């Protein structure tokens, strides 16, 4: 209610035109209303009228902070604290300014004052620990968090805030290389930890660090039973149980145990070579094409940098296209959508490999069959853009936009292509 605030301030100033605090607050309000120059002038004038008012200095500090003049803001907060040293709001805000300026030691002092004044607030404990962490003193940060955990009583069940404090404590111990401390803390606070996946991951990493590889493998496998699509967990499990030569064997074993995991099957393609790759890629590609996965090319594009894999993928998709072609009269061909998505993949593939004419042949055939899909016209536009035909690409993107005029993404892309 900025207008009402200005009106009230004007009413006061009509009777006391040199009342510094009112002038400063009016300047702060005007600054918040984007009247920057007038707001800054009035705030400084308010300080000049009443140099001994912490409110005037506080208002000027806020204005400088909003103006991102953090150095001047700190000076104003320091002056306000000389006048009103026990004001917690000013102490808190000055601490934030010290943090903004990367002055970690004064930030620690500010947070320590707040903690001593309000030790019942969890945020003060965590903020002090974070201040020590940012200053590079992780040992002191751990001591602060341990002190907080010692004074906590009657912790309710499923208290996510307390759980996060414990996990932050564990992460600091992990960064310090104290794997035994991580295990002890997680075991002691097990009943209060809500985020079990993060806790289990820390525990598994700690077990690996101290050399208990069998226990670490069991821990990682238990996590894969919970979520077999997490690439980081799969990678960590392989680092524990497999060498570079045996990674494919262990991945195939995981594939048998988690047959629905797409991530495991995708990681197999990265590791497998030659005949093994062809076999696994055929299964992966056919499954994705039958499921009509439009992002298949983006998924497999990273494999093209590995020798021979690009050509094998091309052969597999071409074989699928020929086998599923409805014009062959083969009764065993797949659904029409699979044939179209095979051609859709090949259009991306040939455009990426520089065979523009073949890419256009495939994408034009799909558009002739299904002209109402904006994605097909967008792909045609990308093929033409990659070939350097910017005007034709803009026309193709405009065709895509006209199919759904309310789609902001299509409108933006069409405008971008026209600008190009």
Task: Please place each PLM-identified region on the residue numbering.
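Non-TPR docking regions that flank or precede TPR/alpha-solenoid scaffolds in eukaryotic proteins
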Residues: 1-420
């Amino acid at each position: 209610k900025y207008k009402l605030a200005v009106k009230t301030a004007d009413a006061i100033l009509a009777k006391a035109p040199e009342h510094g605090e009112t002038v400063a607050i009016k300047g702060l309000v005007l600054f918040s209303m984007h009247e920057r120059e007038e707001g800054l002038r009035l705030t400084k004038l308010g300080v000049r009228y009443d140099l001994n008012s912490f409110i005037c200095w506080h208002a000027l500090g806020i204005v400088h902070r909003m103006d991102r003049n953090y150095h001047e803001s700190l000076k104003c907060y320091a002056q306000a604290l000389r006048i009103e040293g026990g004001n917690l709001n000013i102490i808190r805000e000055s601490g934030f300014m010290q943090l903004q300026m990367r002055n970690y030691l004064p930030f620690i002092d500010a947070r320590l004052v707040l903690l001593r004044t309000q030790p019942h607030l969890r945020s003060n404990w965590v903020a002090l620990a974070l201040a020590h962490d940012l200053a590079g003193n992780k040992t002191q940060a751990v001591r602060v968090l341990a002190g907080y955990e010692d004074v906590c009583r009657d912790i309710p069940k499923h208290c996510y805030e307390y759980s996060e404090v414990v996990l932050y404590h564990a992460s600091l111990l992990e960064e310090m290389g104290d794997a035994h401390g991580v295990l002890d803390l997680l075991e002691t606070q097990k009943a209060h930890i809500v985020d079990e996946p993060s806790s289990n991951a820390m525990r598994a990493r700690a077990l690996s660090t101290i050399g208990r590889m069998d226990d670490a493998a069991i821990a990682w496998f238990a996590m894969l039973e919970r979520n077999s699509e997490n690439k980081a967990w799969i990678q960590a499990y392989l680092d524990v149980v497999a060498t570079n030569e045996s990674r494919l064997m262990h991945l195939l074993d995981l594939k048998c145990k988690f047959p629905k995991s797409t991530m495991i099957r995708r990681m197999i393609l990265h590791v497998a070579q030659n005949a093994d790759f062809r076999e696994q890629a055929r299964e992966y590609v056919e499954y994705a094409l039958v499921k009509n996965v439009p992002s298949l090319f983006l998924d497999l594009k990273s494999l093209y940098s590995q020798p021979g894999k690009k050509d094998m993928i091309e052969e597999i998709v071409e074989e699928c296209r020929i086998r599923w072609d409805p014009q062959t009269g083969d009764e065993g061909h797949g659904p029409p959508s699979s044939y179209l998505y095979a051609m859709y993949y090949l259009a991306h593939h040939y455009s990426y490999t520089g065979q523009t004419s073949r890419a256009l042949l495939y994408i034009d055939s799909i558009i002739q069959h299904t002209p109402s899909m904006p994605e097909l016209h967008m792909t045609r536009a990308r093929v033409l853009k990659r070939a350097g035909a910017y005007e034709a690409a803009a026309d193709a993107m405009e065709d895509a936009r006209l199919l759904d005029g309310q789609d902001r993404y299509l409108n933006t892309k069409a405008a971008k292509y026209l600008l190009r």
